[in-house]
């Protein structure tokens, strides 16, 4: 178990892929190849072997942690003489654009649902809490989309606080990657899940990162277990460019797409534009706001070439 980063070495237990995979401990595979196909994102190459080696041990770990939290809650309820509470266990998944957070979140949701202790697992992405496109334009934040200031943090924190407090039904806005905007009049309802997975760029931020008020609550204040999906920046940029080319052939070809004007680009033209977007928006956001929060995570999944997990770091 080694880590090149001295901070990570001090804070984490480091597992190579083979070491981590044995911790599955006979947990059965509950996904088929078709299930996995439905969970994959654009330009993702996750295989059933990846699920077996990486995600099944992780689902076992999370199941043990959630059960321990549930037992502690029952003890506290008995001590206080009150009815069992309905506060969900909240897992956050952070990381860069194009690292595969969404696919990781969907796979974990599918696996965790199969444990009898917590069959109801909801997944919410923070994309829906981006300010509406018109507001971003008005505030001059369109070129800062994805940066912390482009999110309605008040709405996001109020949402997660309501879910954590056990409120019966809590609505979250829905985001469209086609229109590049919130979908008006539509929402996702979260109704007292056993586990809520919250996926987004900046979910590991704390009040210390806020230029406004270090005292106000942040998403991380409500999270029970946090995961950071990590990769070297040159790989992230490469994956972003590859994904951009895939979108150009797919989603961008939709006339309703905000990026429809990119659909007719040649490969070379598309690569130039994708590289510019990375260098001016996604790269700086990673360096300034996302990567500095990495060592706050309880668990880091490190990816290498071809999106394959190479190491897992678990907080001591």
UniProtKB/Swiss-Prot annotation:
Protein name per its UniProtKB record: Pantothenate kinase
Main location: cytoplasm
InterPro entries hit by this protein: P-loop_NTPase, PanK, PRK/URK
Gene behind the chain: coaA
Pfam families per UniProt: PRK (PF00485)
Superkingdom assignment: Bacteria
Top-level EC class as recorded in UniProt: transferase
Family membership noted in the UniProt record: Belongs to the prokaryotic pantothenate kinase family.
Enzyme Commission no: 2.7.1.33
Keyword match Nucleus: no
Annotated catalysed reactions: (R)-pantothenate + ATP = (R)-4'-phosphopantothenate + ADP + H(+)
Keywords, sorted A to Z: ATP-binding, Coenzyme A biosynthesis, Cytoplasm, Kinase, Nucleotide-binding, Transferase
The protein's annotated pathway: Cofactor biosynthesis; coenzyme A biosynthesis; CoA from (R)-pantothenate: step 1/5
């Amino acid at each position: 178990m080694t880590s090149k980063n001295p901070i990570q070495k001090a804070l984490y237990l480091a597992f190579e892929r083979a070491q981590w995979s044995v911790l599955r401990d006979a947990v059965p595979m509950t996904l088929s190849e078709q299930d996995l196909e439905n969970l994959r994102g654009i330009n993702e190459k996750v295989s059933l072997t990846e699920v077996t080696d990486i995600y099944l041990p992780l689902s076992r770990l999370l199941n043990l942690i959630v059960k321990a939290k549930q037992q502690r809650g029952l003890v506290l309820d008995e001590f206080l003489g009150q009815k069992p509470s309905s506060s969900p266990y909240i897992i956050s998944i952070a990381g860069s654009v194009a690292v595969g957070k969404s696919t990781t979140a969907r796979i974990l949701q599918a696996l965790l649902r199969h444990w009898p202790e917590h069959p109801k697992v909801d997944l919410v992405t923070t994309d829906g809490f981006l300010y509406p496109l018109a507001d971003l334009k008005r505030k001059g934040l369109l070129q800062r989309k994805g940066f912390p200031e482009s999110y309605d943090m008040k709405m996001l924190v109020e949402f997660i606080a309501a879910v954590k407090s056990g409120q019966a039904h809590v609505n979250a806005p829905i985001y469209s990657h086609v229109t590049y905007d919130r979908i008006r009049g539509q929402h996702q309802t979260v109704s007292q899940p056993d586990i809520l997975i919250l996926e987004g760029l900046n979910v590991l931020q704390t009040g210390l990162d806020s230029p406004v008020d270090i005292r106000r609550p942040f998403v991380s204040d409500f999270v029970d277990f946090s995961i950071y999906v990590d990769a070297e920046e040159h790989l992230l940029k490469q994956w972003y460019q590859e994904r951009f080319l895939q979108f150009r052939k797919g989603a961008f070809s939709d006339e309703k797409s905000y990026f429809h004007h990119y659909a007719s680009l040649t490969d070379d033209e598309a690569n130039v534009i994708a590289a510019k977007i990375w260098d001016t928006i996604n790269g700086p956001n990673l360096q300034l706001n996302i990567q500095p929060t990495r060592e706050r995570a309880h668990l880091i999944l490190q990816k290498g070439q071809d999106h394959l997990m190479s190491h897992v770091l678990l907080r001591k």
